[in-house]
């Protein structure tokens, strides 16, 4: 087979570089269309790639080999300046090994076992790129909201070129700047959680000051901040001014729809974990145990004045801490199929955080890292999932069974299967969800906004006459009442918050969750650092109350009385208008705002209806009809008894 080497050499004051991914994808697309792709290998020599995701996309769109000469030259320069204490061969090998490890990790998340199978697989979804660019250069890759076109890409390349070759021949600043992609830097990459918003949220909840909270949400929802898809949407407020606040559903009723995210005991401290549970139990909401189990000492407090028992008990692939008592203490049992911030990966608790008391709760060994496998090894089909749902329902008849999915293209079809399998709740988790132990490439490049997955799920369930059978929940960095109202209008009935409650308890976004060095005692097991925890349940309660109150203000302006009335009302949302030619003006939210049926179609059920819930027929199980009646007297007297029964394959659980 022949080889074609694409080089970025020759770039100078008068010659602009073509983005390497665009060039590779264009060449590969041409070769596929002319049926020559199997006769030639594409080798790219480029200065652009330096991170795992860069190489993963180049390989995924057709490159056979990549020579990242600038990254390797930079290593050589760093060694010469004494910044790296290795010789060049060691340093370059370590760098390449890290890249290979990252690419293998990405391939494994997609269920691909060889790099040859990964090459040219195009297993990506684009966010913010126009269909014209995708159809021409990245065919078969999904891009649902449109975005920048070829002219915009050219302008960006020109801007980067001019930063290296000054068109006015003036002196250039050759220093390298930190763009603040992962950590906040002044006047660089924008972050929703920044020093200002963190300070305002903490002060508002600590002082119980709603006016300060409104200042916080004003910063989050600022018109000039276009960080999320929902920031491009606006409301169609009622022309008559709406309804009086007194006619809107109460704060207390709305708060019962709120949940805290699945953060395990181990990933966060005992104090932080219990603080959230106490807060949510007081307001009638639900806290989530995460996948790390829960101590019996907390479970027995259920129903008491200081109730530390998490209402939601999570079952993940590792089954850490899952016992009969754990399951029977739940009001909701959640099966974690994936995690919003790192879909395709399992949970990971670093070894340094597995203290003896954590190992005890998780039934594991201290000092040994705990990794949940990416898949559940007993779930390879919807039928397998249906069996696990049925088993868990038999373990706790009173608990709702929830299934956690992530926002991705096609999640609607999966959600339809989950609804048919008997789940009571479907959670759509967005990519903004935080996680302390995820690789950087996953945090920044895996998952999708919850707006996409939520809208698709709601629309698909309606079209398949399944919407009334399940509750839809959404989470992923919901920071204001506006965010929650939009989530409701796109189809969600319940709402999860994780980062915000942590911030109210003192989190200052040091981003060292995985290192066990959290300076405020939130995400550490170190006994000395835990003493610095000063969070209170009241702070979390204040946040939830403020969110519900702000929701009520929007609902009043919309003329909506209850959250149930609000669910699915995407017809009350409209895309904002931006000046022609701007990046924002090229975003197309029509697919998200599509309503499968008009509001006037009264026969269509747009939200959960309790009467339509899945019937497991638990009263007809072999347990209820044979085993329990036979054992009733022995159980009452706490005696042993042997019985003989016929078990058939129709008896799914016993």
Regions found by a protein language model. Give the residues of each.
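Short, small-residue-biased leader/transition segments that mark boundaries at the very start
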Residues: 2-6
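Gly-rich Lys/Arg/Thr-decorated short loops/hinges at beta-loop-alpha junctions or inter-strand turns
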Residues: 7-15, 37, 254-260, 343, ...
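Conserved, mostly hydrophobic/aromatic
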Residues: 8, 58, 114, 280, ...
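Glycine/Thr-rich beta-alpha phosphate-binding loop at enzyme active sites
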Residues: 12-24, 28, 366-380, 414-463, ...
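Flexible glycine/proline-rich, aromatic-decorated loop/lid segments
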Residues: 24-30, 37, 52-86, 93, ...
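Glycine-rich beta-to-alpha transition loops that act as phosphate-gripper elements at the mouths
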Residues: 40-52, 291, 404-410, 468-482
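Catalytic cores of alpha/beta
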Residues: 49-61, 410-421, 479-492
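Conserved, well-structured core domains of diverse proteins
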Residues: 90, 94-97, 101, 105-108, ...
């Amino acid at each position: 087979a022949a080889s074609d080497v694409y080089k970025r050499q020759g770039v100078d004051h008068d010659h602009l570089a073509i983005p390497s991914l665009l060039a590779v994808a264009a060449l590969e697309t041409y070769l596929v269309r002319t049926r020559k792709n199997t006769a030639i290998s594409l080798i790219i020599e480029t200065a652009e790639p330096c991170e795992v995701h860069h190489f993963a996309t180049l390989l995924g769109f057709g490159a056979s080999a990549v020579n990242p000469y600038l990254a390797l030259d930079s290593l050589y320069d760093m060694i010469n300046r004494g910044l790296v204490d290795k010789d060049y061969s060691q340093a370059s090998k370590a760098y390449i090994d890290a890249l290979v490890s990252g690419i293998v990790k990405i391939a494994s998340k997609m269920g691909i076992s060889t790099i040859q199978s990964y090459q040219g697989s195009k297993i990506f979804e684009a966010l913010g790129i126009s269909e014209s660019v995708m159809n021409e250069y990245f065919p078969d890759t999904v891009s649902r909201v449109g975005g920048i076109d070829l002219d915009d890409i050219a302008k960006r390349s020109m801007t980067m070129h001019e930063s290296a070759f000054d068109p006015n021949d003036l002196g250039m600043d050759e220093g390298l700047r930190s763009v603040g992609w992962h950590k906040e830097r002044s006047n660089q990459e924008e972050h929703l959680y920044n020093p200002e918003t963190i300070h305002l949220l903490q002060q508002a909840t600590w002082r119980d000051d709603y006016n300060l909270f409104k200042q916080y949400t004003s910063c989050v929802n600022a018109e000039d901040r276009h960080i999320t898809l929902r920031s491009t949407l606006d409301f169609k407020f009622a022309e008559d001014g709406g309804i009086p606040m007194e006619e809107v559903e109460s704060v207390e009723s709305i708060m019962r729809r709120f949940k805290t995210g699945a953060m395990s005991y181990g990933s966060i401290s005992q104090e932080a974990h219990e603080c959230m549970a106490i807060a949510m139990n007081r307001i009638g909401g639900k806290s989530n145990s995460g996948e790390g189990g829960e101590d019996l000492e907390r479970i027995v407090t259920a129903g008491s004045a200081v109730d530390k028992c998490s209402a939601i008990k999570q079952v993940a692939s590792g089954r850490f801490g899952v016992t009969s008592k754990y399951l029977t203490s739940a009001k909701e049992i959640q099966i974690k199929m994936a995690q919003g911030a790192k879909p395709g990966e399992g949970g990971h608790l670093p070894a340094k955080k597995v203290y003896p008391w954590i190992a005890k709760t998780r039934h594991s060994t201290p000092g040994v890292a705990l990794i949940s496998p990416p898949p559940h090894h007993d779930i390879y089909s919807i039928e397998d999932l249906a069996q696990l749902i049925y088993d868990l329902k038999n373990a706790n008849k009173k608990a709702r069974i929830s299934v956690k999915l992530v926002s991705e293209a096609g999640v609607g079809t999966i959600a339809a299967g989950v609804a048919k399998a008997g789940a009571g709740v479907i959670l759509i988790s967005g990519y903004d969800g935080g996680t302390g132990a995820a690789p950087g490439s996953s945090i920044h490049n895996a998952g999708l906004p919850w707006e996409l997955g939520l809208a698709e799920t709601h629309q698909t369930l309606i079209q398949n006459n399944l919407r009334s059978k399940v509750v839809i929940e959404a989470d992923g960095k919901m920071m204001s009442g506006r965010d929650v109202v939009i989530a409701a209008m796109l189809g969600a009935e319940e709402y999860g918050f994780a980062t915000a409650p942590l911030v109210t308890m003192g989190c200052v976004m040091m981003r060292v969750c995985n290192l066990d060095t959290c300076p405020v005692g939130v995400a550490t097991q170190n006994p000395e650092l835990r003493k610095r925890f000063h969070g209170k349940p009241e702070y979390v309660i204040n946040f939830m109350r403020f969110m519900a109150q702000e929701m009520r203000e929007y609902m009043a302006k919309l003329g909506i009385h209850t959250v149930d009335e609000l669910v699915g009302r995407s017809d009350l949302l409209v895309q904002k208008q931006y000046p022609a030619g701007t990046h924002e003006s090229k975003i197309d939210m029509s697919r998200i705002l599509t309503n499968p049926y008009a509001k006037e179609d009264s026969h269509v059920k747009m939200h959960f209806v309790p009467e339509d819930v899945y019937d497991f027929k638990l009263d007809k199980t072999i347990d209820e009809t044979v085993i329990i009646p036979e054992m009733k007297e022995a159980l009452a007297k706490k005696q042993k008894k042997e019985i003989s029964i016929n078990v058939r394959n129709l008896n799914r659980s016993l």
